[in-house]
Amino acid sequence: MIDLTINKTGLEHNIQKAKENNIIIPTIAQMQNPDLIPEKIKAKLSHTGLWDVDPVNLFRISWHNEAKEQGGLFQAVPNYVEIPSKLSGVPCRIIAMSGKWFPTGCHKVGASFGCLAPRLVTGQFDATYHHAVWPSTGNYCRGGAFNSKLLACESVAILPQDMSKERFDWLKSIAGQIIATPGCESNVKEIFDKTWELKKDPTMMIFNQFAEMGNPLWHYNVTGYALSELFEAVKKPGQTFAGACFTSGSAGTMSAGDLLKERYPHLKLAVGEALQCSTILDNGFGGHRIEGIGDKHIPWIHNVKNTDMAIAIDDEDSQRLLRLFNTPEGKTYMKDELGMSDEEVEKMAWLGISGIANVLCCIKMAKYYELTENDVVGTVLTDSAVMYQSRIDELNQLHGAYNAHEAAMDHARHMLDLKTDSMLELTYTERKRVHNLKYYTWVEQQGMNVEDLNAQWYDTKNTWDAVHAQAKELDELINEFNEATGLLKAL
C-alpha cells in the first residue's frame, strides 16, 4: 500500500509553497469526472494552452480533454482512435484512447502525478528541500518534470541517451537537470544504478515509476475508468468488451486492465513487449526501438497474476507503420487504396511508436481468439507521432524516399500479415514464473522485501485491491491540502 503518513513540517512547507505559487491540486475523482471541477477553474482553462506551464493545467490530467491546443475544456467521451477493419485486417473493433491531448502530449503526466501527489500532500516530499528525481525511458520523466514545474518543485530527469531528440529538446526547457544514461530503451538497469548514486544525497527523492504504487492507483482509477466509459459510449447492440492490450514499460496501464476485468469478467488482458526484448515471453533480453516499453525486467507494480496473455511485437513493424501513418505517400495510400476518410487518416498521427505496438497487440489477440465484429478490444496511445519526427527522418535516410508501392508493402507485411506467433496464453504456472522474475530485480538488487513480493501473489485483497481503494483517502488529503491553502475559496 501507499504510505500516507503525515510529515507535519514538510506539509506546512508545501502548503506555503502552494499559496505562493497559486497551486490548487486536483483530486482523482475530478480526473475521472471533470464535471466535478469548479467552474472558475474551467474559466481559467478556457484561455490556457494545453502545454502552458501553468498550475491550472494540473486539472487537464484527464482523458476527457477537448482536442484543442488552446483553451480546451472537457468532453463526455475520451479522445480515441478507432482502427478501421480495412486497415487492421481483423473484423473486431479496436478502440485506442489517445494520450495526445494531455499536457506534454502524453498520459505519463497522470502516472507521475499519481506518484508525486501522495508524498506532496502528506509532506513526505518537502518542496522547499527535496528534488524530485524521475527515472524513466522517456515520457515519464517528461511528465514528472512538467508536474514538478507546475507544483514549483525542483526536478531531475533521468533517461537513456538514445531516446528521441524531441524528448531531450523539450526537457531542456522544463527539467532542472537532465541525466542521460548509457544505452537505449531497454537499458533500465543503468537508470536504476544512477538512482542509487543520487540517493546518497538526502535532498534527492526518487519517484520510481516501476515501483511506486501511485502509478497503478492512477491508471486503475482514471485510465481504467475512462476506457470503460469509452466502451459504453461507442458499443453497438450485441457487442462485448472482449479484450484489452497494453505494452509494458512500467506496467502502470496494466492496472487499467484490472478495473476492466472487474467490470467485464470475460475480458482477456494482454501485456505486450518488444520481440527483441521478450522478457515476459521467454526471459529474453536485448535492445529495441519501441520507445517507452520493454526494460529487461518485470516491474514491481505489474499484477502478473491477473494477466492472461503475453504478446511480443517486432520493433520493425512499429517503425515501418510509423512512416506509413505519417508521410504524404502513406496517407495517400490509406485514402486511395483503403478508402479511409480524411479524419481517419489524420487521426493515425495520434499513434506514437508504443501506441502502434499496442494496436498490433490488439490485432494479434483478435486473430488468436478469432474475434468477430461483435467483439471490441481496447488499448491506449501513450503519445503521438509529434515525439518521433526525427525517427521518421531517420527511416527515410535509411530506406530511401517513400512511395505508394512501399506504403502498400508496409501495410501488407507489417500489419495485415501479423501471425499468432510470439505470443502465449498464460497458465497459472506461467504467470507465477513471470511474477517470480521480480525477485532478481527488486529483492536482490533494489532492496524490496520478499514477504511483500509473496503478498502480491497470494494476498490480492491487501495488496492490489487495497492500493486501488486508496484513491478515496488520497482525495481526502488533497481536499484538506487545498482547504489549508485557502486558494479554492479565494477563486
Task: Please state what every model-predicted region is.
Residues 1-491:
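PLP-dependent amino-acid enzyme catalytic core
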